């Protein structure tokens, strides 16, 4: 499904991804792990088609994703319909006057008729158990409530792949537990999950495979999540835990 070969990406002169090679198959639940600034968020943006490789190649379902193709509005919409992205800061993707309008925005951009748009909004409100949010202003919601609305917006397009950047950040324990259970259900239903996270307590519940980055912006490990969590020396080496971690 996702094939990344020898990909490098920089912000001006600062390298964010350094010769990345990675394959992700349909239905996998993959965690991207590493210290802040190691390249996790940049890789998620590349997978979602927000940016394209400077060097190397990125293929989705066998088709190479290039800057030129992403400039084509039709191609870009089709890609974003299949790959949903939940940003770390929910405020960056919530900008409409009500939760209903927020969730309806994506389907309308895809050209769906209003009956289908309304059905999708209602289905997503029910799926996320936020039916009472329908007429509320997104700006007035709590952090956890905003995260649920952001996920509902993405789910309204019924993507094959769900990409989440630090989804546990800023959530209280109850909302974290809800999100873990929700993601597990999505994965069991066949959705491919790609999640960046620092949460060592919950990562084994939401992923079966872990990709570990070092501070040189390269991948240093690709193994089962449970195996990685047992390798404390490796986690210390990439500054994901400190010397007092047990």
Task: List each language-model region with its residue ranges.
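Conserved ABC ATPase signature
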Residues: 137-141, 145
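Helix-to-loop junction immediately C-terminal to a conserved catalytic motif
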Residues: 48
């Amino acid at each position: 499904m996702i094939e990344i070969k020898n990909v490098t990406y920089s912000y001006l002169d600062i390298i964010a991804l350094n010769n990345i090679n990675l394959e992700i198959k349909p239905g996998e639940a993959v965690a991207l792990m590493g210290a802040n600034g190691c390249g996790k968020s940049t890789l998620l943006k590349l997978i979602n088609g927000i940016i394209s490789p400077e060097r190397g190649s990125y293929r989705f379902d066998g088709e190479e994703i290039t800057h030129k193709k992403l400039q084509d509005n039709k191609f870009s919409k089709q890609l974003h319909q299949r790959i949903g992205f939940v940003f770390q800061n929910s405020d960056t993707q919530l900008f409409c006057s009500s939760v209903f309008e927020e969730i309806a925005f994506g389907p309308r951009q895809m050209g769906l008729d209003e009956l289908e748009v309304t059905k999708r909004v209602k289905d997503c409100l029910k799926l996320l158990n936020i039916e009472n949010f329908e007429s509320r202003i997104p700006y007035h919601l709590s952090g956890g409530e905003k995260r649920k609305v952001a996920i509902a917006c993405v789910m309204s397009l019924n993507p094959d792949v769900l990409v989440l950047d630090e989804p546990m950040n800023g959530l209280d324990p109850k909302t974290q537990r809800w999100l873990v259970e929700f993601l597990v259900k999505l994965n069991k239903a066949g959705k491919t999950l790609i999640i960046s996270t620092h949460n060592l307590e919950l990562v084994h519940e939401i992923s079966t495979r872990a990709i570990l980055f070092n501070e040189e912006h390269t991948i240093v490990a690709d193994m089962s999540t449970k195996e990685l969590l047992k390798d404390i020396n490796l986690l210390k080496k990439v500054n994901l835990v400190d010397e007092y971690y047990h």
